[in-house]
Amino acid sequence: MGYVKWSYETLNHFCGDVFKAFGFTEEESNQIKDVLLTADLYGIESHGMQRMVRYHKGIEKGTIHPQAKPEVVFETPISAVIDGHNGMGQLISVYAMKKAIEKAKKTGVGIVTVRESNHFGIAGYYAKMTCAEGLLGMACTNSEAIMVPTFGKKAMLGSNPIAVAMPADPYPFFFDCSTTVVTRGKLEMYNKMEKPLPDGWALDKDGHASTDAPDVLANIVAKKGGGIMPLGGNEEVTGSHKGYGYGMLCELFSSILSMGVTSDHCCTFPDKTGICHGFMAIDPAAFGDPQAIRRHFSEYLEALRESPKAEGKERIYTHGEKEVLAEKERRKHGLPVNDNTMVELANLCGYLKLDFDKYFDGYELPKDSKFFTGNY
């Protein structure tokens, strides 16, 4: 299966109509699609448009409640706990990070945890929200258990991504990564591309290395065992315990401080996922002149980029640089969408009674795709 490119405007229009068909208001739809398409613009297709089918399934199953509103259930001048009431993760998370930013502007720091939410997209979107306010930001989330702890054979932690962003010149520092070798979304992309997984990514239900994406994904959903390795693989000598430990840090800032559902129990309930998040905003002014701190940081980032390159390497990137370049390229030349994802979007249009050809006129669906349900 290959890819087809679409303009940002085409995908933006389509996503907005899909989320309104899901039952969200136009304002809510605009916010959700902005999170998803930002991921696609950054080159993180695993957390972009392809997630819409999963959200539709959540709404149909009753684990995502489109009408739910987040509620502050505990609060201090520097902190808050929010109950998302099983609403849409993107909407809850924007609300939570805005709360953290508000507190940071008043006190120097704002820390907000969330329980009873859903998948929120890329963590970096929320961390980067702080940069527009001149603040340092952090965001993290737990998820359905996919990470097998070091020396284990059963998934007990989520992908548990952690993102950090801070203003700098000429563009912000922006670091966002899962604490697993890869995310579940990456396995889903390999499944759609019908390619075997690279060695060192996943384990089967018996704890043995596996390159079979459909089997690993099925075992994760059915809780049969196996899953994705922590950053560093599955041995201490390669640093497995470090990825496992970073995953636990994320769990602390999301499910533990919020008194929410830990990853090993997420997505085991009939009417909720139980996913939890953590957000932090810090005002550099709490440490001195914020402009001087920004210059100091920017100079260091420039020194990193200009440091000696390894043989055969032309460039050293700082975190966030590739995303800036990807967004510029994709806004100009279009966003690639996998053919099997296009099939899923056509299926979705069939369910929602939307005219697929209205948005993607001239595209010929690969009817031999294993993802085609015939609902189009």
Show where each model-derived region lies:
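Secondary-shell segments that build the walls of catalytic and ion/ligand-binding clefts
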Residues: 196-266
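Residues forming anionic-ligand binding surfaces in small-molecule and nucleic-acid pockets
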Residues: 73-83, 94-110, 210-232
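Catalytic-core signal marking the mid-to-C-terminal active-site face
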Residues: 2-14, 252, 257, 262-376
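Active-site cofactor/substrate anionic-group-binding motifs, chiefly glycine-
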Residues: 47-101
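Phosphate/diphosphate-binding glycine-rich loops and adjacent basic-rich segments that engage nucleotide
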Residues: 147-221
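Acidic, glycine/proline-rich low-complexity segments that act as flexible tails and inter-domain linkers
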Residues: 1-8, 13-32, 37-38, 45-66, ...
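A generic, well-ordered mixed alpha/beta core segment in the N-terminal half of proteins
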Residues: 79-169, 177-178
